[in-house]
Every structure is written in C-alpha cells, then in structure tokens.
From Swiss-Prot:
Gene that this polypeptide is encoded by: lpxK
Catalysed transformations (reactions): a lipid A disaccharide + ATP = a lipid IVA + ADP + H(+)
Region (Disordered): 89-117
Cellular component terms (Gene Ontology): plasma membrane
Protein name: Tetraacyldisaccharide 4'-kinase
One of the GO biological process terms: lipopolysaccharide core region biosynthetic process
Organism: Leptothrix cholodnii (strain ATCC 51168 / LMG 8142 / SP-6) (Leptothrix discophora (strain SP-6))
Length: 348
C-alpha cells in the first residue's frame, strides 16, 4: 500500500478500538457488508451457487478477522501433524501479491514476487507440493493432477472462498477475538464469527486463552531461536542459544506481518533487548528499509524469503540479518479432532 493508504488504514483501525464519529459513520457500510456476506453464504448453502468438490478431503484454514491471526503457521503445523499421521498433504493458497493469475506450482526457485511470500515460505518449511492461484479450485485440481500421491489438501486463507467444498474449517483467532464485533469497515470482522457452514468447524486460538465465546483449542506459539540469513537459505535450523554479540546492546527487529508487535514480544521473551522496526504486512523490500548504520537486524521468515543473500551482500555488505522462525505447538486434542473429522481419500 501507499503511504496515504497505510495512514488511512491505521486511522480506521484506531477507530475500531476507540469508537467515535468515524466508527459510527462506517456502521451503515458494515451492515451492507453483513447482508452481502450472509446472502452469499446462503446462495452457496441452498445450491443456487455451485460448490466444487475435489478428489481428496479438504481442510480450509482461515480467520474471521482482517489482519494476521496466525493462518500460515497454523497451516504449517497442520501439515506437519498430517504427515506424522501418515497422510500426504498438499497446500493451495492464493499467493498474496503474486503477479500471475493462473494456477502454478511453488518451487525452491520461485520468488515472492511471482508466487507470494507466504506460499514460498510454506514450500520451504513444509517440503510438500504447494500451488497458488486466485481460483483455489483450479489450483487444487492442478496440484492433484501433478501430484497424485497427495491424499489431503490444506487450503491456506480460504475461509471465504466458498466455491471450494471443504470437509473441515479451521478458524483461527488471536488475542483480539472478534474485536468490536462489527464487520468491515466499521470493525475487523470479514464475516460473522458464527457464520453457518456445512463443514465441520474447529476453532483454534493463537492465544493463551479463548478470545471469543466459541469453544476451541489453544495453540502455543514460540520462536525457535535465531539463524543467520545465509545459513537459513541453506536449510539450517535456528539455535535456541543466542549469539553473544546480540545480548550486549539493543538490536533492530523488523517485521512486515499483520501483527508485528506479537513478533517483538516473542523476541523479548528470548531475553533480547530490541528496537522495533514495524513494516506493512507483505512489505516488498524494493529498497532495504533500515538505517545505513545498522549492523544487525532480526526478521521473520515471511520477510526472509524476500531477502536474497546475494542482494544483501551487494547492497549492504556490513549488515547481518538474523531469521527468527515461528513454531506452533498444536494441542493433542486439536489434532485428534482434526484427524477424526477427515474422511478417507475419495475415489476420483
């Protein structure tokens, strides 16, 4: 987004929390939004608009609120749980910011500009087939045609893509819960939190305790530690033991994610003194945003996929970039409920 758009979005988000004239002025639009969303779901549920079923069970991961609630780390954790259960999952995603319209695979040679930052991160972390496309049905069919061994699809950020028939919806909330309870633009909700569906719904809280009245499970999020960018690109794991040089003085921490404050708080729990440097979600890194004198900076994995090592060496040879991978620990009760809700692979 442009600077003007960023400032407008920030002002609207403040109005969600503070109320006042702006939030009241946006309420009529929110009521129209609620009517449109409700009507759209009703048209799909009654069969007036057709849903498309794929040849394998489908798990959709999404959230009811705008902004980062933890969908991507949830998707990665679900994929890992499916693999441990003997399933062979694949991932489909829209590919935020992608320049292409057609369904296409994500590979180690893909760029964030061509497929989106989150799909590229998921491919690197999960090492399973990942396809992106605005049409999730087309992306899913293309993935299954290219990888017939896949027996379950996980759709990242597809909760509102209703044409894709799903067996399970995993709805992710963070500490914000439903916010002020209003739909966009008067509040953060994309749709009512109790929107009806024919799929099995499982609520997962990316928080220490439930943040809505909906029953669900609480995941534990934690940082794995730190790893230098060059080693991260080569597949090295993060080390929990912090580099001594980062403990001596405050270090710059940067995050282009939906809720950067959450990342900064997690770094502090590791014992680091940080100087927060928040960036807009999906920041493109057309230029390096940090002060010229910066020697060390800690970033998220979502940002790291947009920082080729060769570029950093050419533009800022004295800068060391550290990556802090985020891990999600899913409760056993959630995994058991998810696996029990999945049917076996359907015949083609």
């Amino acid at each position: 987004m442009s600077g003007t758009a960023d400032r407008l979005a920030a002002r609207i988000e403040r109005a969600w929390q503070d109320g006042g004239a702006l939030q009241w002025a946006l309420r009529p639009l929110a009521l129209l939004m609620r009517g449109a969303v409700t009507a759209r779901r009703a048209l799909y549920r009654c069969g007036a608009w057709r849903t498309e079923r794929l040849g394998v069970p489908v798990i959709v991961v999404g959230n009811r609120v705008a902004g980062g609630a933890g969908k991507t780390p949830t998707t990665l954790a679900i994929v890992a749980a499916l693999q441990q259960a003997g399933r062979q999952p694949g991932i489909v995603s829209r590919g935020h910011g992608s320049r292409e319209r057609e369904a296409r695979p994500v590979s180690a040679d893909s760029t964030a500009q061509s497929v989106g930052d989150e799909p590229l991160l998921m491919q690197r972390r999960a090492q399973v087939p990942v396809w992106v496309g605005r049409d999730r049905v087309a992306a899913g069919r293309a993935l299954l045609a290219a990888h017939p061994q896949v027996d379950v699809l996980v759709c990242d950020d597809g909760l509102q893509h209703l044409r894709l028939r799903r067996d399970v919806e995993v709805i992710v909330f963070d500490e914000r819960g439903a916010g002020n309870g209003w739909l966009l633009p008067a509040g953060p909700l994309r749709e009512p939190i109790d929107a009806p569906t024919d799929a099995r719904q499982i609520v997962l809280y990316n928080a220490e305790r439930p943040s809505t009245a909906l029953p669900g499970h609480c995941a534990r999020r934690r940082l794995a530690g730190l790893v230098e960018l060059g080693a991260w690109w080569q597949g090295a794991d993060a080390r929990a033991e912090l580099p001594p040089e980062l403990k001596r003085q405050p270090v710059l921490a940067s995050a282009g994610i939906g809720q950067p404050g959450r990342f900064f708080d997690s770094l502090r729990t590791l014992g680091l003194a940080i100087e927060p440097w928040p960036l807009p979600d999906h920041h493109g890194f057309d230029t390096l945003p940090w002060p010229a004198q910066t020697r060390d900076v800690i970033v998220t994995e979502k940002d790291a996929v947009k920082l080729p090592l060769q570029r950093l060496r050419a533009e800022r040879p004295g800068l060391r970039v550290w990556v802090a991978p985020l891990l999600f620990d899913l409760p056993e009760t959630f995994v058991s409920e998810l696996l029990a809700a999945l049917p076996a692979r359907r015949p083609d």
